[in-house]
Amino acid sequence: MKFKNILVILNPENEKQYALARAVRLVNEQNSDAPVKITTFMTVYDLSYEMSTLLSPEERHLMHQGVITQRQKMIQPYFEKYKSPNIEFNSIVVWSNNEAEAAVSEIAKVNYDIVVKYTQQESISSLIFTPMDWQLLRKCPIPIMLIRDGDWRHQRRILIAVNVADNDDNHILINKKLVSLGLDLADILERGNIHLVTAYPPAPINMAIDLPEFNSTDCSNSIRNQYLLNMKELRQKFGIDEAHTHVKEGFPEDVIPEVAKEIEAEIVVLGTIGRTGLSAALLGNTAEQVINKLNCSLLAIKPNCS
């Protein structure tokens, strides 16, 4: 898979526009046969324009258009900076007080391949995921890349969080899509390399109290061995080296960020579902805890993404 149509959500407060820079690098590295379309998206809104009773609807509309035109002119220098025969630039600026809803509406109208958005880094160890980020993660029907800067690291390690707890058809399908997308990204980045991670649950300690004959060590080893077998089956399907698979005891919200930090991952790939957060190994609040602990970029994909 190569990206042919990319939507970049701009941040007016980010002067360097890291999301646009990352999208441009992505296009330049994938060596497409035809120009790739990069569309920038931005919302503008000023409540004072809505509250004025002195303006007619037509006058208010003209003022909106004036602000929109001004913002579009501000974007042009970036297009000049990244001008390339490989890229066809387009800009969309809409008047809206709900950036996420406006973005999802735009995505629904056009056949975009991926959304790229910058997410502010709060400190060395964590990122700030804004309310808009969370809305997009829940509602965006296509893969979304939330990045922390404008360039790719030298190692370009891609960590994919998978669920190998069982042979559930949904888990198998999601794992396949996650790994396939990760491999596509690694192929585009040339030096990109794939790692897989899964977390298996600790043995239930309380069971030893009710059942004296229960051996928690044997139980833990049994769970681990099953996860190792399932992970082996998954990695062999895609030709991934055993040294690049990580099967660790613990909870996903702890294991995934720990492994990402340990291998210095460039990006973590997760499966998402709309109403309950992230799935595969991840459900509900667990997903939010994983994301809040990440110190790298994130690529999220829904199971129904083609």
Which residue stretches match the model-derived regions?
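A short acidic, glycine-rich active-site loop
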Residues: 59-73, 215-226
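General small-molecule cofactor/ligand-binding pocket signal
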Residues: 39-41, 90-94, 145, 195-197, ...
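Short secondary-structure boundary segments
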Residues: 42, 119, 198, 271-273, ...
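Structural beta-alpha unit
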Residues: 1-2, 80-115, 236-268, 276, ...
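Short beta-strand elements of ligand-binding domains
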Residues: 116-119, 143-149, 299-302
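Short, structured interface segments
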Residues: 131-152
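Glycine-rich, Arg-bearing micro-motifs that act as flexible, cationic patches
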Residues: 117-135, 267-292
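Small/aliphatic-rich secondary-structure junction motif
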Residues: 1-59, 157-213, 237
